[in-house]
Amino acid sequence: MAYVEMTVAMMKQFGVEVQRPASDTFVIAEHAAYQAREYQIEPDVSAASYFYAMCPVVGVPAKVCHVHWESLQGDTSFLHVLEQMGCRTEEEPDGIRMYPPTEGFLGGVFDFSAFSDQALTL
C-alpha cells in the first residue's frame, strides 16, 4: 500500500473520513476531529523481511511478532513472493510464521514495484 493510502487508512482508524472524488483529490470535512483510542503500532515490515528472508536460506521457521496480513504496509507482499518460491506461511494470533520450502527454493519473475525496498532483500 502506498504511503498516501496508509495515511488515509490510519486517519480513518482515528475517526477522520477522507473523501476521494477523484484519484488526485482528497476532501476532509471542515470540523473533522481525530478520536483518541488504543492503537497497536505495527512493526516495520521492511525490517522484518530480513528475518523472513533468512527462513529459506537457513532452513528454519521464522516469525516476527505483530506482523499480520492486514498490515497497512505494502512490504507484506514480500511474504507472498517467498510463498511463491516454496515457503509456507501460517498466521498465528501473535504474528505470521514462515516455514522453509520442503522441496527446494523455487525461482521466478516478480514485480517489486509496490514494495521496492524488498528487491535487495531477495
Regions found by a protein language model. Name each.
Residues M1-L122:
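Short, structured segments at the rim of ligand-binding sites
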